[in-house]
Amino acid sequence: MQETDNLLKTLNVKSLLEALLVYTPKGYKDLNLLERFETGLSGVLEVGILEKRNYAKVLKIFAYSKRFYKNLELVFFNYSAFHHSQFKTGESLFIYGKLEQSSFNQAYIINTPKIITKFGKISLIFKKVKNHKKIQENLQKLISLENLKKEGVKENIAHLLLEIFFPTPHFVKDFETNKNFPSQHLNALKYIEMLFYMKNLERKKLQFGAKIACPNNNERLKAFIASLPFKLTRDQQNAIKEIQNDLTSSIACKRLIIGDVGCGKTMVILASMVLTYPNKTLLMAPTSILAKQLYNEALKFLPPYFEVELLLGGSYKKRSNHLFETITHVVIGTQALLFDKRDLNEFALVITDEQHRFGTKQRYQLEKMASSKGNKPHSLQFSATPIPRTLALAKSAFVKTTMIREIPYPKEIETLVLHKRDFKIVMEKISEEIAKNHQVIVVYPLVNESEKIPYLSLSEGASFWQKRFKKVYTTSGQDKNKEEVIEEFRESGSILLATTLIEVGISLPRLSVMVILAPERLGLATLHQLRGRVSRNGLKGYCFLCTIQEENERLEKFADELDGFKIAELDLEYRKSGDLLQGGEQSGNSFEYIDLAKDENIIAEVKRDFLKAASVSRGTFEN
């Protein structure tokens, strides 16, 4: 055990699985003597040096193979005196290289051969590593069938991994021929990568006692739902039921609720507050606009006996004298909540809205502030960014996850991909909608001019709109007053020129047109969020994707689909799997081998094996 720990420390990794992924060989150097004199083979030859010739910047050393009685040329480009000194006429030595044949004179050649003093083994080649030899020694001490089994690796997978890290000449030849590992070995690496990911998730699944187990507020919940002027969807009801079970538990819950744009997650948030009553709820939103929006929704829909407070950065001091008093049932705020020094012991539930907009440390800090004597508050994290089914499959055993797919009011949004020459179509529709007292947002790819991007910037394009329309507002992420600008636009504006800062959560009831410039530069998830701002209150909506590209299959497919969960699947076809991971859950924040779009069977296999092993170790597995 001590030896294993020392080896892991030397390799700067925390587990054998991590070592397998960090130090997967990127190639091999077969230092065995060549068995055949055949082009395309790499290996060691014993050669005798016959003569040397200089050709401009090329040094040719004429030699012969002592074993195969064949002449060959050793070629160095941009050679130096060092190469002359290494290869002396009349001497014999061992060299490593790849045997090739010249297309000019059919001579056998080895380009840039290396002199070998020790041979008879296969060296592993690692990416971005200095001491290859030492790392290989430590790895091969660490990796064994026994150690792999201890990590939960199945025997058939373990044998494939052993072939990767203890390769035979035949295996190396296959690797060089295919320029990659054979498919079964690649699948073994995928298995290990997903197993490593799941083990990391399991480490985060620590159970703590709930600081406060909430009462069963079934009657109060029924009254709240009955008071709403609309009917909840089946998905909303299921989410509320799952949360109700969580809140009454003596174990602190941590649940991720993922909903599509416009799925009505705000009503689920408010129902959670009702279920927590008379205990307190703390809700953190990423921006003042969203916090105010949630605050107004709470005032509108929560029962009149609820006392709701709002804490923003600007109003922090003003409200600090009476905020968090016993009478308050719900506190809604921004990151200003993280800097409040008051005792949060009475808060039974902590909610984070648009959770992906916060770092892991920020979410943890809020939870920690509301913890007491080792017991934690219940925690709900809401996100309006759907994730692919395969990623949900991997997470579901370790993170309680609820999906809200149904949309209360199906949106009527027409999405068109247009070339800049067709911009007159956009202008006509904008004029029509403004005449109806509707609103328009134009999203620019960047704030200031850039030679690298063939589109106008926000600052360059503003004058175009200001000359043609009234009530044009401009803002960006760099604007200190952006939230005030957006609020003023919501009340009295016609056109808002902005960057993607308006991507998430903001409710603009009169917004009917979204124009996105350079949409090819944005991920489909971002495009879906932007489009989701349109048609919030039953208006017919229009989303124009304005590009300089003649064709873009990705954008055309996006235009034909409104379902955020299907778009998340579509996104996998065009993005690396790692782009969908957030919060540093997987080393390097990306999967190198697993393809979330294609490897559902492997993910399901790993999950099944992992849960079976875990239940056996607890003595709870049943056949």
Curated annotation (Swiss-Prot):
One of its GO terms (molecular function) is ATP binding. Residues 422-578 form the Helicase C-terminal domain. PROSITE patterns: HELICASE_ATP_BIND_1, HELICASE_CTER. Residues 32-120 are annotated as: Wedge domain. It catalyses: Couples ATP hydrolysis with the unwinding of duplex DNA by translocating in the 3'-5' direction; ATP + H2O = ADP + phosphate + H(+). GO terms for biological process: DNA recombination; DNA repair. This is ATP-dependent DNA helicase RecG. The gene is recG.
